[in-house]
Amino acid sequence: APGTLTELAGESKLNSKFVRDEDERPKVAYNEFSDEIPVISLAGIDDVDGKRGEICREIVEACENWGIFQVVDHGVDTSLVADMTRLARDFFALPPEEKLRFDMSGGKKGGFIVSSHLQGEAVQDWREIVTYFSYPVRNRDYSRWPDKPQGWAKVTEEYSEKLMGLACKLLEVLSEAMGLEKESLTNACVDMDQKIVVNYYPKCPQPDLTLGLKRHTDPGTITLLLQDQVGGLQATRDDGNTWITVQPVEGAFVVNLGDHGHFLSNGRFKNADHQAVVNSNSSRLSIATFQNPAPEATVYPLKVREGEKAIMEEPITFAEMYKRKMGRDLELARLKKLAKEEHNHKEAAKPLDQILA
């Protein structure tokens, strides 16, 4: 079997392991863009008297409505963003054996994966990824960072640092919005983890049957996503009834709030419900930077507003929260698979005239 997806991209029919059930298939095209997700300029965010209040209001409104927004004028240098994107594309263009040198299977911390790093997935995602842990710095395992293309480690280090700064700045705004000290959300993460996932979605022969990344919410605090101009990121705020495709904005970061951010705000801020779709015209690249709390950090609302109840019964660690989330996901997948098998079994047992009726 081919070791990478890039090799399957040229086939005319989609391999059955990527085919999703009908209820999970894309409802909206990858390039049918919506401008419902706000694009917010951060120019002047540090002027305490000036623009800061207005920017804070826009961010809070976006978090209450969607849990997702885009930021421009964010202070991350455009040439750094261009370098990071170029190196990522160059990596995925390498021959399969070069990419597979960094194969992550067998419990390695970081590296190259086809489809997904989760065990027990019934249907595969149409993507290749390279992932590594960048914070805390002591957790960096440079042997798992690609050594090709040249310059990857140096550019990634700078990119990681700049995005850590941007994430903390956004968390300060959300802390203030909750009526807390501005360091509150960052402190709640204890020693903030950062994981970078570079997603590559090759051209797909039958994109209407599959997903690049299945529907989910991110488990962590906040995610900063850099995407190219192709389009494919989709979001829903009514539990999947209607989906919109996020309009790519040159040089912007898409900001998603995760489950941890949702719980800390006592549900006031939404955890973005999203997925990625693919297409048959061109490949797509996105770079997700996940800002997560330390595994031992406590997950519990930082503030419960008057007249409200806490949305969690008890404080738990982030490690436990993550474990429960994965357990639920696998259980849902298992039940779905069972129901499907049962349905197929019943269909097979029907007499032919009934099936054709």
Swiss-Prot record:
Q: A GO molecular function for this record?
A: metal ion binding
* The protein's required cofactors: Fe(2+); L-ascorbate
Biological processes, Gene Ontology terms: flavonoid biosynthetic process
Would I find Oxidoreductase among this entry's keywords?
Answer: yes
Keyword terms: Dioxygenase, Flavonoid biosynthesis, Iron, Metal-binding, Oxidoreductase, Vitamin C
Query: Which residues does the record give as 2-oxoglutarate binding sites?
Result: 284
* Entry-linked Pfam families: 2OG-FeII_Oxy, DIOX_N
**Residues annotated as domain Fe2OG dioxygenase:** 189-293
> Might you give the EC number(s) for this enzyme?
1.14.11.9
Q: Does the keyword Chaperone apply?
A: no
As to how many cofactors bind and how, the note says: Binds 1 Fe(2+) ion per subunit.
Pathway(s) the chain acts in: Secondary metabolite biosynthesis; flavonoid biosynthesis
Q: Name the job this protein performs.
A: Catalyzes the 3-beta-hydroxylation of 2S-flavanones to 2R,3R-dihydroflavonols which are intermediates in the biosynthesis of flavonols, anthocyanidins, catechins and proanthocyanidins in plants.
According to its UniProt record, which protein family does this protein belong to? Belongs to the iron/ascorbate-dependent oxidoreductase family.
Q: What name does UniProt use for this protein?
A: Naringenin,2-oxoglutarate 3-dioxygenase
* Lineage summary: Eukaryota, Viridiplantae, Streptophyta, Embryophyta, Tracheophyta
